[in-house]
Structures are given as C-alpha cells and as structure tokens.
Regions:
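Short N-terminal alpha-helical targeting/association segments
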Residues: 4, 8, 27-29
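Exposed, low-complexity/repetitive linear segments and helix-based recognition motifs
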Residues: 13, 23-24, 96, 289
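Intrinsically disordered, low-complexity segments enriched in serine/proline and basic residues
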Residues: 18-22, 26, 33
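Short hydrophobic alpha-helical segments enriched in small aliphatic residues
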Residues: 25-27, 36, 50
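Cysteine-centered motifs
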Residues: 45-47
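Class II aminoacyl-tRNA synthetase catalytic cores and aaRS-like
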Residues: 52-344
Length: 344
C-alpha cells in the first residue's frame, strides 16, 4: 500500500520497516511497537469523544416553562438561554433569562460564583447567551420561581460597541409610528416577546389546518412557485427572469390542484402566494400564506361546510393551545370562542 501512510515527514515506501516499528525513530522510544493504524484510531476516538462532550454540553433538556410549572422545585438544573434583563449591585445580580418558552429570574452572588465569573455576568449585555447551573426555588415573585446560580458560563457575549437595539424605549417609539426601525431590525425584533408570541400563534394556526384536513383523509399536495401564466389575473403577476424565458411567482395553487384532483380527489395545501398589489391596506399583501383545498364530487354546501369546519377547528385549537398568548396580545377570547361553534 505505497503512498497511503507517512513515516516521519516522508511518504512510506515498500522498503520501509514494518508498520509495527517505531514511527518517529528510536530517539523517541515512547510509542515503540505501536501500529500506525492503532495510533490513528486512538486519535480519532479522542476527537470523537471531545466532540461528543461538546455536543452533550450544548444539548438542552431543561425548559423554563417546565421550571415555572414546578417540575424542578428543589432540584439542581442546568439552564440554557439568553439574558433578557439584568440589574443589581457589585455583590448580587438579578438576571432574567429567557428561552423560547418563558422568562425566569436568576440570582447570582459574588461570594458564591467568585470574582471572575460574577464580573463576567455583570458585564454581559442583553441577549448574551449563557449556561447557568443552580437550585430552583419557589418564590412569591411574579413568575413564582427563581434560580439560585451556583456556576455556569457565558457562551456568547454581545459586543458592547453594538448592543441589542430593541429596547423598551425603542418599542414605545415604534408603537408611536416608528415602524421603520423595527423593520430595519427585523432579525432582532423576532427575539422580542411580542414577536415570539405571534409566531407561536401562527404555528398553532398552521398545525390546526394540517390536522383538520388530515383527520378527514385529505392529501397534502405541493405545487411549484414558478409558473408560466396567471391564475388570478395578469395585472398582479410578479415576473421573474428564468434562464432566458419569462416565469412568474404563483398567485395560487388552484390550477395545479385542479389537475391533480382526478387523481387524489381530496387535497389541500398551505403555501405562499405572491401578488403584485400595492399595499393600500393590510389586506393588500405582496406575499402571504394560503390555505387551499380542492374536492372532487362535492356540492356547494359541502364546500361551505369545510370552510366553516376549518375556521371552527382553528379557533378551538387556539383557545386550547394559545389562550395565554392571545390574552397577552389583548385579544378577546370570548370573541374567538364564538367561532369555535358552527354554524356562526
């Protein structure tokens, strides 16, 4: 096997001693008698072990919502999340940490953590990512629980020269009409509780659409987003150059669904649609997500029945899964509950 393994700094040749000979020469004498393949295997195993330890450290199995639900009262946990708020003195810090499920206050004390880690936590800005270990204790404060920090690490620090811009004052200005600021920082605005709440509600809406149709044995059917012609009228088409030809962004899944209907009979989709409409109102959108269905052998009454049934199912799902989120946005649950019963 010439040219595959190296001995010292040169390519191994057939005239070299057997692989069981000392690899680095007699002057080392440390690994004499070891096979090169064994050494390589050992190094690979060490690398995999180190990688496994890192991946295990980065994996997450403790969620703030479970802590707030009392599942870990009196237990030591390892919490992974992002700093949402931080205040305190030179001896104690009250750090609110968030994850995708909620917020919890973490109490960090200098005499427990030591100067190095305490000062690192103290100087960490909003949205720094942290791993905090400590004891979960029930309290009389807002969320009912807090974490007494005993150790941890700052995984990623925010650059002090570029702090997180979405502050409470910035949000107040945005509510007053400065929406361009939030649009310019959309990737960061997603981290705010308001946007997180809306995304969770959206996820439940999509899940309800899927569950409604699948429970009725509808087949989910996807269609291309590049099309050759109009579905809803040529004046709202987005034209796209397509390798020397003209193509358009789809306005609807309808034409493809009609072609597939004789094969599948009952089909649905959730997909984006694109229409070149000027944004005169919130109902004029250049891009939106579209839930559509197609049925063979159906009367007009049956189609309307599915329309009502879908709305009812979505409303019921939101009331069951996202009541807290809807209330936090100021939505009237009694109004939504009216649509959970049909006919309406």
């Amino acid at each position: 096997s010439t040219g595959l393994l190296t001995r010292g700094s040169r390519v191994r040749t057939p005239s070299d001693p057997p692989l069981s000979s000392p690899i680095f020469g007699d002057e080392f004498g440390l690994i004499s008698g070891f096979n090169t393949n064994y050494l390589m295997l050992t190094l690979i195993c060490q690398c995999l072990h180190a990688q496994s330890r890192w991946l295990t450290q980065m994996s997450k199995d403790i969620w703030i919502s479970d802590i707030l639900a009392g599942k870990y009262d009196g237990s030591e946990v390892e919490l992974k999340g992002w700093i949402y708020r931080s205040r305190g003195s030179n001896k104690i810090r009250f750090i609110v940490v968030r994850d995708s499920t909620g917020n919890i206050q973490c109490v960090a004390k200098r005499d427990v953590l030591g100067d190095v880690f305490f000062d690192e936590l103290k100087s960490s800005l909003i949205e720094s990512s942290v791993i905090l270990k400590g004891l979960v204790q029930p309290t009389d404060r807002e969320h009912g629980h807090e974490l007494q920090v005993s150790s941890g690490e700052v995984v990623g620090s925010v650059n002090p020269e570029r702090p997180f811009p979405i502050t409470e004052s910035a949000m107040a200005e945005a509510d007053g009409g400065e929406t361009e600021f939030l649009l310019d920082n959309r990737h960061l605005y997603l981290r705010t509780s308001r946007m997180t709440t809306m995304l969770k509600i959206r996820s439940s809406v999509f899940g309800a659409v899927h569950s409604y149709f699948r429970d009725l044995d509808f087949i989910e059917y996807q269609a291309p987003n590049f099309v050759a012609g109009a579905v809803e009228g040529g004046s709202t088409l987005f034209e796209v150059p397509y390798f020397g030809r003209k193509a358009y962004l789809t306005q609807s899944w309808q034409l493809y669904a009609e072609a597939a209907m004789p094969a599948l009979e009952r089909l649905y989709t959730i997909a984006p649609s694109f229409r070149a409409e000027k944004s005169r109102t919130r109902r004029h959108l250049t891009e939106f997500w579209h839930a559509e269905m197609e049925i063979a052998w159906a009367s007009n009454n049956e189609v309307m029945k599915h329309g009502e049934g879908l709305v009812r199912h979505i409303a019921g799902t939101l009331l069951e899964e996202r009541s807290d989120e809807l209330s936090s946005l100021g939505r009237d649950l009694n109004l939504i509950s009216q649509y959970a019963d049909t006919p309406y």
